[in-house]
Regions:
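General structural concept
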Residues: 1-65
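Canonical WD40 repeat/beta-propeller blade segments in eukaryotic WD-repeat proteins
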Residues: 3-11, 51-58, 89-106, 138-158, ...
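Sequence signature of WD/YWTD-type beta-propeller architectures
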Residues: 3-4, 17-20, 24-33, 51, ...
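Hydrophobic beta-strand positions that form the internal "hydrophobic ladder"
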Residues: 18, 64, 108-109, 153, ...
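Residue-level marker for isolated small/hydroxyl-bearing positions within beta-strands
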Residues: 21, 67, 110-111, 169
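Per-blade loop-tip surfaces of WD-repeat and WD-like beta-propellers in eukaryotic adaptors/scaffolds
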Residues: 31-43, 71-89, 114-141, 149-152, ...
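Asp-box/WD-like beta-propeller blade repeats and closely related beta-sheet repeat scaffolds
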Residues: 44-73, 78-102
């Protein structure tokens, strides 16, 4: 990838791997191309070609997600594989976040099928009826962020809830 422009680079936590996409101005390695590159081994672990330009990349230790205006795809680094994909209402911001619960279990938050503020939370591997859909706003969501609440909730002895919290925001307020 020497001499190529790259965008949306995400360092993989506790790793020498970086996930990034290309640039629309290039004839090869465009903004529809995604690469997971291991700097320690100096090799490409995974290269993906998508149908639409990539808007966002988020990564955890074992997984990464890429979003376009209408789709989210979740990949595992090892073995390199597509493990989950969702189609959603067109959203220029393509909000998405992921959080690992364990090295083989992950939660995904993304915009839903309704373009007016719907938030969808799902998991991999999926469990029957585990998908949660929330009407989070009256306008499109522009940002989604998970927060691991274990530490916070451990300090609240009367609260028996556990797991990640999720926050949303939009350009409309």
């Amino acid at each position: 990838f020497q001499g190529q422009a790259t965008n949306l680079a995400q360092a993989v936590p506790d790793s020498q791997t970086v996930v990034f996409c290309g640039s629309k101005e290039q004839s090869s390695f465009k903004d529809t191309s995604v690469c997971a590159f291991d700097y320690q081994q100096q090799r490409v672990n995974l290269e993906i070609e998508c149908a639409e330009p990539i808007k966002k990349i988020v990564s955890t230790t074992h997984y990464f997600a890429v979003t376009s205006n209408t789709k989210m795809k979740l990949y595992r680094y090892n073995p390199p594989s597509l493990v989950l994909q969702h189609v959603f209402a067109k959203n220029e911001e393509a909000p998405c976040d992921i959080i690992e619960l364990t090295d083989v279990s992950i939660r995904v938050a993304l915009c839903g099928n309704n373009s007016n503020g719907e938030l969808k939370i799902t998991s991999y591997p999926s469990v029957q009826n585990d998908e949660i859909v929330i009407n989070a706003a009256n306008h499109p969501i522009s940002t989604i962020k998970f927060c691991n609440a274990k530490q916070y909730l451990a300090n609240l002895s009367s609260n028996k809830n556990s797991g990640p919290l999720v926050a949303t925001a939009s350009t409309h307020g």
